[in-house]
Amino acid sequence: MKLPVAQYSAPDGVEKSFAPIRDDPRYMTTEGRTTGPSDHVLNAGQIDRDKPSEPERTKDGSQLTYLGQLRTQLTGLQDDINEFLTGRMELAKNKKKAGADEKRIQEEINQLLDGGDGDEDAV
């Protein structure tokens, strides 16, 4: 069976390929790490009513069906993509915060250079 793959590309030139790894347990389950309710919600007493069903097996139960394998592999790929994109969002957030901090510092320096004492609230 050919493995599914996913490609990511962004306007900033970042490219990433995702593919399941054969025999890796992350790609052999329908219970993803990044899907479903958060631990916070579950600890608050909520019940996961949307929990995915187990992957389908052959009649003798010895192996997963083709669609069962595909479901597990796609669940693992979805986790990989979600984790990657979460990391990208964190980087963007940190970069934005660093830019705002740099701008604030530069404005304070300019104000001091223009003769301000940086104590605008003092009477």
From Swiss-Prot:
InterPro entries, A to Z: EKC/KEOPS_Gon7 (IPR014849)
Annotated stretches, region: Disordered: 1-63
Any GO BP annotation: cell wall mannoprotein biosynthetic process
Induction: Accumulates in response to hyperosmostic conditions.
Stretches with biased composition (Basic and acidic residues): 47-60
GO CC annotations on file: chromatin; chromosome, telomeric region; EKC/KEOPS complex; nucleus
Pfam entry (one): Gon7
Cellular location(s): Nucleus; Chromosome, Telomere
Quaternary assembly: Component of the EKC/KEOPS complex composed of at least BUD32, CGI121, GON7, KAE1 and PCC1; the whole complex dimerizes.
Note: Present with 2180 molecules/cell in log phase SD medium.
This protein's name: EKC/KEOPS complex subunit GON7
Chain's gene name: GON7
